[in-house]
């Protein structure tokens, strides 16, 4: 195995609503995430004063970021993915003037990262938007939200033009099909046509952000971000293969629009077959031509699908309810572990788009135990990440252009799916439980030193295979 390229970016990935806390400090408004105490798959709940959402404090990154950045630098990070909390900058979402205190926080954060030699990779909207845009406009179903997002994007592009050179528009934009409130601010019972119209507005907003970035920051790069993970046919029956193709297209269509600049023919047929009419203006079509510079994605699992709907309906155990693959092991949360699938996905996306790729989320959520001596022996996490990084290296050898890898997450954080601290991802243990109890003390896990060595050796310390099939 050859060393990873010298230009390869190594780091970790976080999100504002999973780490920052300080949910109403310094003028921040209420976001949609603040109304989802049970995670991205949970429904919107009215805010009950006095009842804490674990994300209100999260891991208190808002106040403790210097300590965390120092730990990331100790591991040798060259990149850290963060998101800007939109409601920190525009509390209601439709203000003309931004909240200076919110902007100043990210000034301080980016300065701290610069001093540590860590490049920021910044997501504009990571599973949240100002709740004011949902309450007063109806979320992304309203075309007016496009303009408010563009105003927000231009504001932060201008403010951080000398601090940030890598941007992402929407986190896992294709997740809106599974969690409409999380993705586009719509009620869970919204109809399919309404969801796709809201998605269209978001795709236009993403393209406008790309256009603005290219205009204001000619040296910067801006990408999209997809929830990645291939769907395999359950059997070799042609009908299962066709079903798998259609399921993969359901999420790849977002990348097709963002990377190719127009709706693909298969989606035109899908809309016809389902009696969906997308209201699209001529200016929308022009805006969509502003395509991303690179493709970024998360990768946690793969799954199977069958043409037999009775089998599909009985699928359970993971966030997307795919049929389990009998040849793969699963995590404690039912997410199937498929390192080879990452190599296949990287080659698939490279063949499809011929644009640089960036793995901006990948990791193992697990229940860690603190030993009597205070150590955390997370060999299972090391094995998981080792095997995935080996496959990334194989994809590079295949000729795939890969910009970097940011593990999810570099430090324990509030998990997105169900708002749990017990579902731990980090190289750094944070003393906090699902009830919000704990000192928030940071402790290096065994994987901390392992990842530092991987970065130092540019991957030459990786072992070929550590996870065997069941």
Which ranges hold each PLM region?
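Glycine-rich, proline-tolerant flexible connector loops at the mouths of alpha/beta enzymes
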Residues: 84-98
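Active-site mouth loops of central-metabolism enzymes
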Residues: 50-64, 141-143
